Amino acid sequence: QRQMCIRDSDMRETETKVLPVLEMSCAVCAGNVESTVQALSGVEKASVNFAAGTLTVTYNPSVITLEVMQAAVQAAGYDLIVEAEDPVAMQEEKARMHYKILRRNTIGAWTLSIPLALLGMVFMHVPFGNWIMMVLALAIMIFFGRSFYVNGVRHALKGKANMDTLVALSTSIAFLFSLFNTLCPGFWLGKGLEPHVYYEASGVIIAFVLLGKLMEERAKNSTSSAIKGLMGLQPKTARLVTDGREEEVPISNLQVGNVVSVRPGEKIPVDGTLLQGSSSVDESMLSGEPIPVEKNAGDRVLAGTINQKGAFTMEATSVGGTTVLAQIVQMVQSAQGSKAPVQRIVDKISGIFVPVVVLLSFLTFVCWLVIGGESYFSYALLSAVSVLVIACPCALGLATPTALMVGMGKGAEQHILIKDAFALENLCKVDTVVLDKTGTLTEGVPVVTDSYWISDDNIRYLDVLYTAEQKSEHPLASAILCWLEESGAKVCEAENFESLTGRGVRIQVEGVTYWVGSQGLLDIFQAGIPEKVRKQIGQWQEDGQSVVFYGQETRLLAVLAISDRIKPTSAEAVKELKKQGIEVHLLTGDGVRTAERVAATLDIGYYKAEVMPNDKEEYIISLQQQGKKVAMVGDGINDSQALARADVSIAMGKGTDIAMDVAMVTLITSDLLLLPGAIRLSKQTVRLIYQNLFWAFIYNVIGIPLAAGVLFPINGLLLNPMLASAAMAFSSVSVVLNSLRLKFMK
């Protein structure tokens, strides 16, 4: 059973954190950071999302600290934010500064590159033109492209290479060759060759790469808008009440047990319990319901929800990363940072990409010289530089994470939480959905609508029934308890309570055994049903109501009719699933007539009644043996075995249970109509991932041979390094823009 933990309480006592990473310039950098952290003792799993600039790490805090990880990452030439009170805010501030510097460098590089290109391609005979171009190119390299050379050298000293290496190497070769020809033109003139210079290539390559990075940063910022929106729900400060006085403090200062004051129109800062006052609270960010919820003393309120009317005080019960909102944010971040199975292959390719490209560039240079000798030296150099420039590991590195970020973020906005890329990929392959009835297709708030007592002395039996149901965890137990409380039933002394899995409960009072549950208990206790009672049961079942049997020893005492309304959106959800070609099945522990009624109402062709938890698991296995990809949808209580067995486990959440949910997919609002939307979203996201990867691979497969001059013998076409740099910049941006299309898909 797959599960993502925010805090795993198993024997390893591992924790999972999402930490911002700085100074990464391409996908190769992400791989370097990931391998550096993964190699540390005490780290169970590390995954770097280049698009988000984050490290998701699962580690044992008793073996390794975050500071040790930070030191290792810094030693590798990058930075990891671990000590800040608000690491996300710090990352955003650094990202803003980085973007500001990047924009300034891009504008500066283009300001000098335009006259440089004009001098090199149009006004080639201007006096001292070569010297002017040399100064312009050198200024671009030093003032606006310095980071490429600093990072390239830094990684080279560590025996590593990345995209900065390719840019630094290509522009340096073009500049040094041009400088040699400017200083020693006679070397080539003596051989009867023209001493060409390519200063404009050095400058324009840097300008195009910077422009591509600027556009990429803008686009990547859009991919993370959903998670930023979730983070923005939580206020930065809270009004702490101490000895009757209010003081505004950062929410990071709040502790469990603190008393906080909340005024009308304000966002609630932490999870807690309302102490004084009453109000209506907008919980749509969690529940999806636009109608405000009335809150009174003793009620639970959640961080990020909005207090609409009255002022109140509350006691903090969850702060920081333990609030429901923080748990959701961490879940989405972890999901965005997860890797699709295909990404493992991409990572391996990215790891060797730069060395292979450098080798191809060298072979290109050698081949040109072998074919044409010294007269082709300029062609050889230009082609080698073009190969270095056009190759783009970033497009490969961005293909999967950008699509995942947009897809997972869009899901969160629609109240759909997908745990990781594995779940996403499995969800898109689902062709069969198995639905539990109670709480999935129905409201999950059953009520007792009728009762039939065989015994006359039912007052005593009401107390016993009340005691038995108080200990039961079955969804129908709450309905019976509410009904009994209205009848004035009380708890009585009891012993030997036993839960009969899938059937009901058994309890002893004063040495006498009582039982309550499904019709299967009649066989266990050999109790019969009077004919007049049987007719009443038949009528209830015809109406789609569930029947609960209550007895003493071998005698049936009473039967209760319980109704659980079908959700308004269930029929539409089933219809949408069928439109997508998905086979829908219904499993329920209720009787056959109830199952028939629900299946007929919702137009579900396959159903099975009177199933116990192990029956549900066997049903899932039987479908899988037929070659079907099965998703199981349930409430996670009685369906745990089936959920674990299914290819995709889907839980119907209720907003406040999110942090404890271990299903692959959680529908936060318990609205089944979210399910077809989740499957559609998974298909769209996976399709985009493969589109991005196809484009990234095809771009490099076609671009590198073109840059090497494969068309030159055919039509004399040789790709200019400046055009190669433009193509490289476009490839990364196009991948991100393609991922952003997902935002607007229905």
What are these regions (language model features)?
Residues 3-128, 154, 245-246, 326, ...:
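Flexible metal-binding regulatory segments at protein termini and peripheral loops
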Residues 8, 476, 485-597, 612:
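Signature of the cytosolic headpiece of P-type E1-E2 ATPases
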Residues 14, 31, 418, 509-511, ...:
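Conserved ATP-binding TGD loop and adjacent catalytic N/P-domain core of P-type ATPases
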Residues 41-63, 199, 228-322, 422-465, ...:
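Conserved cytosolic catalytic loops of P-type ATPases
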Residues 101-237, 348, 451, 719:
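Transmembrane helix-loop-helix hairpins at the membrane interface
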Residues 122-125, 157, 176, 410, ...:
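Membrane-embedded alpha-helical bundles of multi-pass transporters
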Residues 203-264, 295, 345, 418, ...:
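Juxtamembrane coupling segments of multi-pass membrane pumps/enzymes
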Residues 286, 382, 392-468, 623, ...:
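Conserved catalytic phosphorylation-site environment of P-type ATPases
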